[in-house]
């Protein structure tokens, strides 16, 4: 179970990075000093609840568990920003500058936050 939890947490970390941090800019983010990825300090506390149900087609009943943590994380974070700030972010990562720009643009157009 510990390895499975680690796989799920790793997928969530990748989704968090996709939503909030990771952006490849040619010539500017070509190393880990400039290309930001989530670290332990960026991760929220998580409680992973496992439901064991063997896959009859998987080897010894195994299933893949990395993707289920990755796939919904970025959309969930972007939906939370929409709910909290009233603006939709159209380009990821949703950096503070991009969120602020979306709020200001929404206000200039007479939107929810304006």
PLM regions and their residue ranges:
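C-terminal catalytic domains of large/alpha subunits in multi-subunit enzymes
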Residues: 1-114
